[in-house]
Amino acid sequence: MLSPKRTKFRHQHRGRIKGISSRGNRICFGRFALQALEPVWITSGQIEAGRRAITRYARRGVKIWIRIFPDKPIRTRPAEIRMGSGKAKGSPEYWVSVVKPGRILYEISGVSETIARAAFQIVAYKMPIHTKFITSLRK
């Protein structure tokens, strides 16, 4: 699963997901892409599950680009600790990627549109949000 090798700070504020994605919202590498339609935190496990689904379905000849990276640490309160007293004090439990609407999640090339559409249908089922299949204009 994806996670940063090192970070400048150990903890991060949770923050709010406002607005739409102004970066990473166009197809840059592949021919077909999966685009997010809602704001969400996507965990490294969900990203990896999507990658595995594409490689299993599309088999040989597919090239995959993962356009998101989990760089936000999420901490949870340890077991048997009383509620309250500020933020969760534990070490990072898992990593998430902050995704705004319009962000490209995955891109693929080297397969036909029907195979790409079917592969992304499986991936979309594993994502916690509504997504959209889009095609690059260039051939």
UniProtKB/Swiss-Prot annotation:
<dbReference type="GO" id="GO:0005762">
    <property type="term" value="C:mitochondrial large ribosomal subunit"/>
</dbReference>
<keyword id="KW-0934">Plastid</keyword>
<keyword id="KW-0150">Chloroplast</keyword>
<dbReference type="Pfam" id="PF00252">
    <property type="entry name" value="Ribosomal_L16"/>
</dbReference>
<comment type="similarity">
    <text>Belongs to the universal ribosomal protein uL16 family.</text>
</comment>
<keyword id="KW-0689">Ribosomal protein</keyword>
<comment type="subunit">
    <text>Part of the 50S ribosomal subunit.</text>
</comment>
<protein>
    <recommendedName>
        <fullName>Large ribosomal subunit protein uL16c</fullName>
    </recommendedName>
</protein>
<dbReference type="GO" id="GO:0009507">
    <property type="term" value="C:chloroplast"/>
</dbReference>
<dbReference type="GO" id="GO:0019843">
    <property type="term" value="F:rRNA binding"/>
</dbReference>
<dbReference type="InterPro" id="IPR047873">
    <property type="entry name" value="Ribosomal_uL16"/>
</dbReference>
<dbReference type="InterPro" id="IPR036920">
    <property type="entry name" value="Ribosomal_uL16_sf"/>
</dbReference>
<dbReference type="InterPro" id="IPR016180">
    <property type="entry name" value="Ribosomal_uL16_dom"/>
</dbReference>
<keyword id="KW-0687">Ribonucleoprotein</keyword>
<dbReference type="GO" id="GO:0003735">
    <property type="term" value="F:structural constituent of ribosome"/>
</dbReference>
<dbReference type="GO" id="GO:0032543">
    <property type="term" value="P:mitochondrial translation"/>
</dbReference>
<dbReference type="InterPro" id="IPR000114">
    <property type="entry name" value="Ribosomal_uL16_bact-type"/>
</dbReference>
